[in-house]
Amino acid sequence: MSVTMREMLEAGVHFGHQTRFWNPKMAPFIFGHRNKIHIINLEKTLPMYQDALKYVRQLAANRGTILFVGTKRQSREILAEEAARAGMPFVDSRWLGGMLTNFKTVKTSIKRLKDMEVAKEAGATETMSKKEALMFEREMDKLVKSIGGIKDMGGIPDAIFVVDVGYHKIAVTEAAKLGIPVIGVVDTNHSPEGIDYVIPGNDDSSKAVALYVRGVADAILEGRANAVQEVVEAARGGDDFVEVQEG
């Protein structure tokens, strides 16, 4: 589903930060300012957003994994919902240093969480003392909060989608170190440098954030559906070219 400029306006995508907090590297994407607030040029944002979605679609069609990252209060809930809808991993609580660059260690925690889930399912907490059960639940809750969204990731993602690149600069740095492409929402107070697919836009409004993450989730589902359709059509097409050898 394609997004229009009107929808971007209604979601407040064009509202940047106060002019005194601006990053000069965002100048090419700024239309002007009003009441000391920078206004982002949506004529630049819309095609760049569409480019990002095109990349997402292609990646999803090739069975790629995109890690959603958004831990700010206004993006947390919708980001987790949309990532789950698209069947993609997400980080919505806190970015743990080394989540990408030290994935081997993170895998140990994932295994621990999965083992605990299996144990709980089997009724392990029922045979524990009250104190043990409480400790177990606390540890499990902590793991779910920190790595629950990536427990089925399996390995390093093919790309990461970040809402607010400044707030998540550790995630962006780790991705760059590993050569993982970054799709990022960049507001007027941050730098677009090092971001492979820049989406110049408001990163604070929950309406704007919902627009970005829904769009990315839709693009993933479209990419997957298109890939399935191509396989079906190729199989059908194969039937048309079967030569019948006459004896």
Swiss-Prot record:
Gene from which the chain derives: rpsB
A single MF term (Gene Ontology): structural constituent of ribosome
Keyword Transport in record: no
Protein name according to UniProt: Small ribosomal subunit protein uS2
Source organism phylogeny: Bacteria, Pseudomonadati, Pseudomonadota, Betaproteobacteria, Burkholderiales
Record-linked NCBIfam families: rpsB_bact (TIGR01011)
InterPro entries: Ribosomal_uS2 (IPR001865), Ribosomal_uS2_bac/mit/plastid (IPR005706), Ribosomal_uS2_CS (IPR018130), Ribosomal_uS2_flav_dom_sf (IPR023591)
PANTHER family: 30S RIBOSOMAL PROTEIN S2 PROKARYOTIC AND ORGANELLAR, SMALL RIBOSOMAL SUBUNIT PROTEIN US2M
Family, similarity comment: Belongs to the universal ribosomal protein uS2 family.
GO biological process: translation
GO cellular component, one term: cytosolic small ribosomal subunit
Keyword Ribosomal protein part of the UniProt annotation: yes
UniProt keyword list: Ribonucleoprotein, Ribosomal protein
